[in-house]
Swiss-Prot record:
Gene source species: Escherichia coli O157:H7
Protein name per its UniProtKB record: Phosphoenolpyruvate carboxykinase (ATP)
UniProt-recorded Gene Ontology molecular function terms: ATP binding; metal ion binding; phosphoenolpyruvate carboxykinase (ATP) activity
Gene: pckA
InterPro entries: PEP_carboxykinase_ATP, PEP_carboxykinase_C, PEP_carboxykinase_N, PEPCK_ATP_CS
Protein residues bound to ATP: 213, 232, 248-256, 297, 333, 449-450, 455
N6-acetyllysine: residues bearing it: 87, 523
Length: 540
């Protein structure tokens, strides 16, 4: 029996795991590298060495999260606070689980982990010591331990000596639930949370992102109840200390626009905002790698080296990687510690209060302006709407826009009613004197996408304050304040109506989009806070 750093089998017995052969506690990167490449490993446990020095793994049939298999125990702790899938008008993934079924699932996972050699990783979620979660991850798979070591904040030796976990994640990816039908569940796989026991259970899915986004969902529950904003956004800071946060759904430019040589990165995906300022939840990045090239995204490409962990990429016989191959999944990924990126905030991923809050949308309808300045109520309205749209081809070759509305630009990870996140964000913004902007990185009446050059000039104008002093006019129907001119931006594109052959053409498309906004927002009118915000949206 080898016990590391005082972690005893008795401590694991408290979680229901018995007869542990060996505990590999907070393994070093070098040890994980050896473990992942152990030639005796088979199946999804096995890692493959690539020519870039990073290990690649296969996550099996699950190459993304499994939202239909997500459950939260409904008990006295959560009954009146959680945003439940079976209550109210809004649709979400927070399906209730009975305490009895939870005990059954816990028994399956603890049985799977008992009698095994286990990897235990203690890490922090949240860069602020006052509000961070101390999380203990328990798994029998070396690369899953590597994933959480990359993605969460790695404690110092001193912090580890006094580490007391306040959340436990037990990953039993190899076990499934044969009684799922009788229990009324979605499938034999499960990702379940218990806020009373402060525990997450994983069964059947090997996808690493379940641990990352699982803890994000928990921060999204715990922090807003303390008045702290919990945000699905990227964040950066200027040399002078001016902080900006960028909200946006996939494909809107969140990573591209927050990666700015003039500014340092705080983080790329999950942040909190408390009395001290904006802080990263994570200690790493989880970047998409499909069609990755050294020329287009040198920072991410250069981060793929020893200690990075690739998922579901195609590795050729000679160890080279085919980043263009999406045959396994389009959601190929790499996790790496944040210090693999050069231009970051050090030593801790946090900064002061944000003064600029940017909502990115890619409007394929061609209606919204490239930039507008939002009022406090409009800020809440557009935050709750979380709008973007893609162009999807139809069989006749016509490209029709497909709208997406995702509350708070991250509906899949919300644990409370969306209006609670909007209220906390606006309070934080008001206290900091922050201003919000809606930036359309999508299309206009010409049918072309707004150029990255123009969008970068708009972001620069927001960040250097010139947009705050610009004269504005109001776009009808959406009541958005648009600047009359901005340095470095073609004035003609600022008013979307100018990009159409006639104002009537814009009007027609605007009515279509306004109706979509109004219909979507109806789900928030079941609370007084939501109903009061209808006036801040479009009017037909």
């Amino acid at each position: 029996m080898r016990v590391n750093n005082g972690l005893t089998p008795q401590e694991l017995e408290a979680y229901g795991i018995s007869d542990v052969h060996d505990i590999v506690y907070n393994p070093s990167y070098d040890l994980l590298y050896q473990e992942e490449l152990d030639p005796s490993l088979t199946g999804y446990e096995r890692g493959v060495l690539t020519n870039l020095g990073a290990v690649a793994v296969d996550t099996g049939i699950f190459t993304g999260r499994s939202p239909k298999d997500k459950y939260i125990v409904r008990d006295d702790t959560t009954r009146d606070t959680f945003w439940w899938a079976d209550k109210g008008k809004g649709k979400n993934d927070n399906k209730p689980l009975s305490p009895e079924t939870w005990q059954h699932l816990k028994g399956l996972v603890t049985k799977q982990l008992s009698g095994k050699r286990l990897f235990v990783v203690d890490a922090f979620c949240g860069a602020n010591p006052d509000t961070r979660l101390s999380v203990r991850f328990i798994t029998e798979v070396a690369w899953q331990a590597h994933f959480v070591k990359n993605m969460f904040i790695r404690p110092s030796d001193e912090e580890l000596a006094g580490f007391k976990p306040d959340f436990i994640v037990m990953n039993g990816a190899k076990c499934t639930n044969p009684q799922w039908k009788e229990q009324g569940l979605n499938s034999e796989n499960f990702v379940a949370f218990n806020l009373t026991e402060r525990m997450q259970l994983i069964g059947g899915t090997w996808y690493g992102g379940e641990m990352k986004k699982g803890m994000f969902s928990m921060m999204n529950y715990l922090l807003p109840l303390k008045g702290i904003a919990s945000m699905h956004c990227s964040a950066n800071v200027s040399e002078k200390g001016d902080v900006a946060v960028f909200f946006g759904l996939s494909g809107t430019g969140k990573t591209t626009l927050s990666t700015d040589p003039k500014r340092r990165l705080i983080g790329d995906d999950e942040h909190g905002w408390d009395d001290d300022g904006v802080f990263n939840f994570e200690g790493g990045c989880y970047a998409k790698t499909i069609k990755l090239s050294k020329e287009a995204e040198p920072e991410i490409y250069n981060a793929i080296r020893r200690d990075a962990l690739l998922e579901n990429v195609t590795v050729r016989e000679d160890g080279t990687i085919d980043f263009d191959d999406g045959s396994k999944t389009e959601n190929t990924r790499v996790s790496y510690p944040i210090y693999h990126i050069d231009n970051i905030v050090k030593p801790v991923s946090k900064a002061g209060h944000a003064t600029k809050v940017i909502f990115l949308t890619a409007d394929a309808f061609g209606v919204l302006p490239p930039v507008s300045r939002l009022t406090a109520d409009q800020t809440q309205y557009h935050f709750l709407s979380g709008f973007t749209a893609k162009l999807a081809g139809t069989e006749r070759g016509i490209t029709e826009p497909t709208p997406t509305f995702s509350a708070c630009f991250g509906a899949a990870f919300l644990s409370l009613h969306p209006t609670q996140y909007a209220e906390v964000l606006v309070k934080r913004m008001q206290a900091a004197g922050a201003q919000a902007y809606l930036v359309n990185t999508g299309w206009n009446g010409t049918g072309k996408r707004i150029s990255i050059k123009d969008t970068r000039a708009i972001i620069d104008a927001i960040l250097n304050g010139s947009l705050d002093n610009a004269e504005t006019f109001t776009l009808p129907m959406f009541n958005l304040a648009i600047p009359t001119e901005l340095p470095g931006v073609d004035t003609k594109i600022l008013d979307p109506r100018n990009t159409y052959a006639s104002p009537e053409q814009w009007q027609e498309k605007a009515e279509t989009l306004a109706k979509l906004f109004i219909d979507n927002f109806d789900k928030y009118t079941d609370t007084p806070a939501g109903a009061a915000l209808v006036a801040a949206g479009p009017k037909l």
